[in-house]
Structure formats: structure tokens, C-alpha cells
Amino acid sequence: MATFTTEQAGYQMQAILQVIGYDLLIVVTGGTNPHIGDVTTLTASTVPETVKFPSHDGRFHKDNFISERMAKRIQRYLAGSCTITAGIHVNQITKAQIAAAAPMTDDLSRQIISWLQAHPVQAEKPEYYGQDEQPR
């Protein structure tokens, strides 16, 4: 597991990366009220898909801006699947803090890419039955 942080405009964002076999789980949180606002899934060769969760005030979270931006940046470095959750909330957020989310996400993405390049994913390849084989 690896942890990456970035700070700008008076708040911090953090990404925790967990390698699971060939797959990655990335949890991005930050601000005054971290949460899970959305989930984005992808592989190196598939279009990212996102599910947004309802927020406490009945609207949907907008954290997909972060997870989808990160997904686009790290996609070509993936060996397997990747699941990104994002949940950043800053109480009484300012326009400057909203604008900072993009470069902060880019910074976290660069840190993750550097880590992946320095620590290539290594896992045993799974074995599968052939088309004419069945479990005994």
C-alpha cells in the first residue's frame, strides 16, 4: 500500500493505492469531510465507467470530476483493472479551492504513475480451464 498527498488552496487531498494481484484500488479523499462520492472503474483498454452516489442534501456528489480525471491520466499504466473512489468535501468551498482540485488531481496522478513505474505490478498469472475442460 502506498499513500500520496498534495495540498493547495488551504486543503489537502490524499490517494491511497492498494495493489490487489494485477489490479489497483485507489481511494482519493480530502477536505473537511472525506467520504465516498463516486466509483470509477477501468482497464488499460476499456472506457472508464462511473457511478455517482447521492449526497446528504439529495443532490449527487461531483467527485467524479476527480476520479475520471485521474483515470484518464493513469489508464495507460494499468496492468489489470483499476477502481477509483473519490470523496472530497471542503466546507464553504471557495472558487479558488474548486479550481485547485484539477491541479491537485494531476499531482496525485503523477505521483501514482511514478510509483507504478518504480514498483511494477508482479503477481502470479491465474490458471483457467480450457474450453473443453470442466472442474472435477
From Swiss-Prot:
InterPro entries: LpdD-like_chaperone-like. Pfam families: PAC_bac (PF21758). Signal peptide: none annotated. Disruption phenotype: Cells lacking this gene are able to decarboxylate gallic acid and protocatechuic acid. Belongs to the CinA family. Probably involved in tannin degradation, however the precise biochemical function in metabolism of gallate is unknown. Gallate decarboxylase does not form a complex composed of Lpdc, LpdB and LpdD. The term subunit has been used in reference to the three-gene operon. Gallate decarboxylase LpdC is the only protein required to yield the gallate decarboxylase activity. This is Protein LpdD.
